[in-house]
Amino acid sequence: MKIAVIGANGNLGSRVTRLALERGMQVKGYIYDGESPDERVEIVKKSLFDITPEELLDCDVMISAYGSGFHADPALNHQAFLKYIELNADTGRHLIAIGGAGSLYTDSSHTVYSYETPEHPDFLREISKNIKLGIDELKKESRVNWTVVCPSSFFDPEGGLTGSYEIGTEGHLLFNESGESRVTYDDLALAMVDIAEQNSYLCRQITVLTK
């Protein structure tokens, strides 16, 4: 299996890349700047928005860890999903894209999105809203085999790989036994690679919780 990883040297993408290589997958890593995360990766220095459909013809899966960053135009997060559609429509390739906790409902009543709550950080609100708009675009598509993987409210960069995670498929946040909505970067990366290997959760928005 060959996968294209967008943002292959970032916080999430480097973890996805490492785990994919450990599974014996080939990795084509797209990076905007910086260095390769591993000498075994076929590196392409290019922005997501400059990728062409033709250069992905040898890839079975695209895993995107793209994020605009906090200081860029939040609308880039919406536009990223439109780019995913352009790159993957009618290819049969499995698109697995990072979403955002803000695009999930707060609970099973499905009345309020997380980004709409007072607790949601102001600097993330427009980013989260645009991610949700992008996911809405995918949900209207019948030409793309997609999965959107949303972190929990606390996306923990330091918790490490526990290997024990829960997946939610109902569109709302999950909470552990301590009442926390938390996932580590490593566990979410593991979930993405598992989904790629198993070709699972097609056309679903899911969330991942570290148990």
State where each predicted segment sits.
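Short, polar loop motifs at secondary-structure junctions
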Residues: 29-36, 153
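Glycine-/Pro-rich loop/turn segments that contact NAD(P) or position catalytic residues
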Residues: 72-160
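A conserved pocket-lining segment of Rossmann-fold NAD(P)-dependent short-chain dehydrogenase/reductase
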Residues: 166-183
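N-terminal Rossmann NAD(P)H-binding glycine-rich loop of SDR-like oxidoreductase domains
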Residues: 3-23
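Glycine/proline-rich active-site loop of Rossmann-fold NAD(P)-dependent oxidoreductases
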Residues: 141-142, 156-164, 195-204
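Substrate-positioning beta->alpha
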Residues: 130, 179-193, 204
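NAD(P)H-binding glycine-rich loop region in Rossmannoid oxidoreductase-like domains
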Residues: 35-91
